[in-house]
């Protein structure tokens, strides 16, 4: 959701 750790965690 942010762009540093939630790149493939929110999809």
Swiss-Prot record:
Alphabetical UniProt keywords: RNA-binding
Chain ranges of the RRM domain: 1-11
A molecular function GO annotation: RNA binding
Taxonomic superkingdom: Eukaryota
Protein name: Glycine-rich RNA-binding protein 1
Organism: Populus euphratica
Lineage of the organism: Eukaryota, Viridiplantae, Streptophyta, Embryophyta, Tracheophyta
């Amino acid at each position: 959701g942010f762009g540093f750790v939630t790149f493939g965690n929110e999809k």
